[in-house]
Amino acid sequence: MCGIVGYVGENSASPILINGLKKLEYRGYDSAGIAVSENGKTNVVKTKGRIKNLEEKLEEVGGLSGTVGIGHTRWATHGAPTDVNAHPHKGGNGRITLVHNGIIENYIELKIMLQKGGYVFVSETDTEVLAHLFDYYYKGDLLDAMVNVMKTVRGSYAVAVLAEDKPGTIIAARKDSPLIVGLGDGENFLASDIPAVLKYTRDCYLLEDNQIAVLTKDNVTLYDTDKNVVKKDVYHVTWDVEAAEKCGYEHFMQKEIAEQPKAIHDTLSPRIKDGRVSIPELTLTDEEIKNIGKIHIVACGSAWHVGMAAKYIFEDMARIPCETDLASEFRYRDPIIKKGDICIVISQSGETADTLAALREAKSKGAKVVSIVNVVASTIARESDDVIYTMAGPEIAVATTKAFSAQLAVVYLLALRFSKAVGLLPEEREKELTKELMCLPSQIENLLNLTDELKTLAHKYVGSDNVFFIGRGLDYAISLEGSLKLKEISYIHSEAYAAGELKHGTISLIEEGTPVFAVATQDKLFEKTLGNIKEVKARGASVIALVTDKHASVSEFADEVIRVPATDGNFLPSLNVIPLQIFAYYMAVLRGCDVDKPRNLAKSVTVE
């Protein structure tokens, strides 16, 4: 949520800031602005709406000159999306200019204190409180002021500040919100995420909580809140700039759907050797795995759907009790965690605020934490006992596709590792299953050929007001994901239900022509789900059945049939999700929606 960029160097700051903000659009935003310093004065241009609106406004005012600046895309939390509430904000008499991601929890009491001191507020934001507070503490020493601000506020933040009497300098800090420093030659950069600086440098500092960075064009110095200099290793980005570009595709989501075979292959292949699973990142011994009392899985959004699938898979293959929680619920219900329990946290960004808080809750109760993360060196990755990276590469579209599939791949690997440790996976069976796993990329390549068929299906149902998804077991977990994909990018109301729950109220919503996706790929549950298909069909539903090649009998009761290859039942989620992603994509395209940046959503939810 929100995005920060900064630049200090010898080149014009404005185009660099704008380019950086465009690379952060995936994070979600409703307004944007930049501030550029020149000749002891910092000028601000900001507006509600998209970055193109900001560019138009910059053109109207003749642009901003200067070689030092900061920029921001805002996702509204305190105050409506307006020009006034957009960042950057001024502090004091205008000598301080500040941008901020996060939430300041004690902003009301600080605002009252500052108002009593004569500070005048023009916006509804908590960020303006930070700007005035920085001015309040600023006596000519940027580091002193930042430390005092950090000791005064409560909440989460990444912040960047310009002071008019310190030309050529940016000071920044973070707590529970990501921030990186890009290292150049005669120039340095600041950003919420790597794509914003990748055009200019591959070398970065990844700031940790309670760290401060002071940037000039020739130097970057890091400090802690005791003002000690912090020495940090340089992180070198290995993936290509093209990985964060569309490369001829109409949308990032379309490109990332097509990249799923590679994401799964790259996640699996280093961890399968000669038909055996090897996860060197996982330090749990066989004895520790045998003594696991319960696996607690915590995640948000689509990652939670991966966790739902993981529960079924772990319990089936390893017979270890498993509980899957929404991270936002887990942390507040005082979960019961006993000795020997482990917690698996799943997050694409590694910065999801609720998931990070849940991780800390689990660790405080003595659980060993294993994370499944896509972004290297992210906060969740750093704070976990073990981290297993998905090799999906940068995922730009807000709606996850390839990261979701790579997360499932890690779940399969963990299930095999756990099953082997507890003595439930003979060597020959392990070889059979790993062979099936390594077939997934090619099977998905074949499913991508269903594009025309699914586009035709989208044309048929694009006018629908409601779409329902049903399934049992693992098919229910993927029904949840299919429903979420559809509603988050096409804005069509959609719900997923466990098929066995239809008679407990949901079936009353089925009317003549209501589209119902029935995911029915699990052999042992097929007949039961077929019964549910008959129930909704009898009430006028248009049934789209998603089945394997083995389930020919469904054709008699379904209006449309989508077939996926047969594989081990526990691996079917990776195949089932592909047609649902493609269908959702074309529904959104046909409805004229912003596929990559759905309204009100953010890629990385870094506030609670």
Where are these regions (language model features)?
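Conserved short alpha-helical segments that host acidic/polar catalytic motifs at enzyme active sites
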Residues: 1-251, 262-294, 305, 332, ...
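Active-site phosphate/pyrophosphate-binding segments
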Residues: 260-264, 268-296, 386-515, 588-608
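Glycine-rich phosphate-binding loops that contact phosphosugars or nucleotide phosphates
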Residues: 290-439, 519-563, 583, 591
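Glycine-rich oxoanion-binding loops at beta->alpha junctions
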Residues: 67, 71-84, 273-286, 310-346, ...
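Structural motif
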Residues: 68, 96, 294-296, 342, ...
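Acidic/histidine-rich
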Residues: 156-187, 457, 462-488, 530
